[in-house]
């Protein structure tokens, strides 16, 4: 059960008849641990061999320092199982290439990860950059097509605008005139026109003064008679009497003020 080899005297072999683990990592070693004639020897020492995960628990080996960078496979991971170990002894070049392939497949390095991340970034940037370029090109193309209009159509549009402006100006002038003259409600004017005040004539004022001296307050029937006789409206007669009463009141207040002083 305990198998001693020139490399590791304290190595404990497996219960099954598998190939020694040293032959899985060193292509120039035979199954029994001896070197193949005609091949160069790998530079390793007993401390490197004792850093294997299945030999680290051996009592005869002392735990050594961490493995060098070139032995990435000795990091505690179990190597792949080869049922037929004959290809390891066939040729050094073939075994070396296959070992490196298995190693790169089982234990991908950081460089491989960074390369894959860089490729993904390039693909992402390519896709989105292309989409962005396409979007900008579409926008530029649309702006260019909008800018390159037919000159005839532009002249036609300008001509219609120029033709419409005189019509609009004449219509606005007409609207202003009608608003000032007639007070048409359909024209939207800010200043609401007021009906021109029609002054009272001297005969009308004389008749109204006589009626006021007789009676300051008149009823509706009397107002109607005055409006018909003087050719005035009821509103005009009513307003005149109101103003005349206020005038009389002011005169009385002024007389009282003068009498005090």
Curated annotation (Swiss-Prot):
Residues 193-252 bind DNA. Keywords: Developmental protein, DNA-binding, Homeobox, Nucleus, Transcription, Transcription regulation. One of its GO terms (cellular component) is nucleus. Pfam families: Homeodomain (PF00046). Residues 106-158 are annotated as: Disordered. The keyword Nucleus applies. The keyword Nucleus applies. CDD domains: homeodomain. One of its GO terms (molecular function) is sequence-specific double-stranded DNA binding. It comes from the Eukaryota. Residues 112-122 have a biased composition (Basic and acidic residues). Gene3D superfamilies: Homeodomain-like. Coiled coil: none annotated. It is found in: Nucleus. InterPro entries: HD (IPR001356), HD_metazoa (IPR020479), Homeobox_CS (IPR017970), Homeodomain-like_sf (IPR009057). Sequence-specific transcription factor which is part of a developmental regulatory system that provides cells with specific positional identities on the anterior-posterior axis. PANTHER family: HOMEOBOX PROTEIN HOX-D12, HOMEOBOX PROTEIN HOX-D12-RELATED. Belongs to the Abd-B homeobox family. This is Homeobox protein Hox-D12a. It comes from Takifugu rubripes.
């Amino acid at each position: 059960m305990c198998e001693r080899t020139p490399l590791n005297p304290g190595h404990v072999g497996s219960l099954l008849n598998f190939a020694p683990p040293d032959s899985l990592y060193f292509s120039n070693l035979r199954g029994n641990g001896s070197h193949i004639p005609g091949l160069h020897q790998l530079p390793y020492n007993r401390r490197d061999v004792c850093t294997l995960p299945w030999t680290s628990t051996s009592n005869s080996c002392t735990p050594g320092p961490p493995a060098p960078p070139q032995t990435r496979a000795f990091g505690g991971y179990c190597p792949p199982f080869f049922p037929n170990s004959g290809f390891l002894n066939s040729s050094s070049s073939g075994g070396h290439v296959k070992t490196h392939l298995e190693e790169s497949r089982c234990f991908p390095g950081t460089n491989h990860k960074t390369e894959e991340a860089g490729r993904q970034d390039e693909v992402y940037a390519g896709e989105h950059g292309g989409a962005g370029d396409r979007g900008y090109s579409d926008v530029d193309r649309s702006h260019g097509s909008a800018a390159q209009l037919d000159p005839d159509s532009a002249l036609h549009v300008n001509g219609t605008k120029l033709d419409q402006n005189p019509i609009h100006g004449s219509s606005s002038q007409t609207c202003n005139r009608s608003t000032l003259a007639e007070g048409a409600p359909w024209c939207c004017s800010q200043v609401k026109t007021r009906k021109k005040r029609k002054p009272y004539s001297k005969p009308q004022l004389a008749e109204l003064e006589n009626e006021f001296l007789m009676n300051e307050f008149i009823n509706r029937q009397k107002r109607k008679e005055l409006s018909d006789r003087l050719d005035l409206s009821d509103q005009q007669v009513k307003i005149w009497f109101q103003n005349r009463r206020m005038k009389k009141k002011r005169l009385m207040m002024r007389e009282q003020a003068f009498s005090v002083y």
